[in-house]
Amino acid sequence: MHARWKGTVSGMLRISRDLYEKIIEHARKDHPDEACGVIAGPAGSDRPRRFIPMQNAERSPTFYRFDSLEQLRVWREMDDNDEEAVVIYHSHTATQAYPSRTDISYASEPQAHYVLVSTRDEAQAEFRSYRITGGEVTEEPVDVTE
């Protein structure tokens, strides 16, 4: 959706502890349904800055889909602010934090870090990041900064 992307793709997600914790908090709050959202950042920067939790239109424990009107509003807002979706995240409630075939087929933002959080273990959330381009999934390290 964001045709202006002009940055480079790094092989690591650098994310602040605050944003990291907000993603996990959202995933736990929406459990047993999958949670979803984006973290916007300056276009081309690969720097996640603005946390945008979104509604799972499916309200499902096994599938997520952004509400189309909310997604349109959020992407327009990012365009207006010269931002892009640096992170697109969602949770898995009963399986590991690895993209499903559906997740892979829906991945349409080549610049984005696709973050998955598994909430299957109440004591400890599993947080992982991937690049998904052309159907290929590559896990990348996550650097949580203070």
Task: Give, region by region, the residue ranges found by the protein language model.
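Conserved beta-strand-loop surface patch within small alpha/beta domains used
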Residues: 2-85, 94-146
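Conserved, mostly hydrophobic/aromatic
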Residues: 88
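Metallo-beta-lactamase
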Residues: 91
